[in-house]
Amino acid sequence: MEADAKPVRHPQRHLNPKMKEVVRKEILKLLEAGIIYPVADSEWVSHVHCVPKKGGITVVPNDKYELIPQRIITGYRMVIDFRILNKATKKDHYPLPFIDQMLERLCKHTHYYFLDGYYGFSQIPVSAKDQSKTTFTCPFGTFAYRRMPFRLCNAPATFQRCMMEIFLTFVKRFVRFSWTTFPSMVPLLMIA
């Protein structure tokens, strides 16, 4: 936290019935997974709102029969507005990889492996002393995160640091082994 940071409590936002149902389902899912827990009070309270999930693009004719590209909305996603908390947070400047540099390094190779973490950020626990800062309010109560949520300013850097600590030895050994010996899935299968 920045030295001059003052806690802020946002009031609950009004949600229409459709958005309220989206929030209810997400809250139940997060509670069941143990990612959040109910809290009675906190100095820091953020509010929730819903944003559209974009599914793709379609083309729709307008009044003049011109074809206009339009985004398809497949549903809504609950998000927490951590902007005030993020302003008060001391920034972590851990280097994040640039996608173009990663692609340049990979373009020479014929085999690629992809690891996908289920709820990636949520695999990382939030420090007990900082959990109250992740508190949010919604029509179903006030909750705090046990696990790192999206939209915290330091979440990407923290996640990258953890992944590098976990996989650095594996990546160095695997990359050297697979690219020089067997450019196939054999090393990946042996490790699994």
What are these regions (language model features)?
Residues M1-A192:
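Retroelement reverse transcriptase polymerase core
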